[in-house]
Design a protein with these regions (language model features):
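Negatively charged
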Residues: 16-99
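Sec-dependent N-terminal signal peptides
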Residues: 4-13
Length: 99
């Protein structure tokens, strides 16, 4: 029994978040910012909190924060090396001023 509980505890502590891609990107952002529109600290997201998201498989971020005037999350740790499209990503995201 102890061994089973230990294995379960290790599994839960090392569980990874759901992968983001173009297929679920828009829905993930919408869901997260519905509960935490300023900082993206959506603890209920299957992807974790927005500043920690693994966006390495996202290709198109066009318009992601468009018209989200209060958005100001720190997304400086995102790996956007595979993103090709960022048109109007921060259009009218007036409060966004992170480095």
């Amino acid at each position: 029994m102890k061994k089973t509980l230990l294995i379960l505890a290790i599994t839960l502590s090392t569980a990874s978040y759901s992968q983001l891609s173009d297929d679920n990107w828009s829905a993930a952002v919408t869901q997260c910012l519905a509960t935490n529109p300023i900082d993206g600290l959506c603890t209920n997201s299957p992807h974790g909190i927005m500043p920690d998201w693994d966006v390495s498989n996202v290709d198109d971020m066009s318009g992601t924060f468009k018209n989200r005037s209060t958005f100001n999350a720190d997304i400086s740790n995102w790996d956007v090396s595979n993103v090709r499209l960022m048109s109007k990503m921060f259009y009218e995201a007036d409060d966004f001023n992170q480095p």
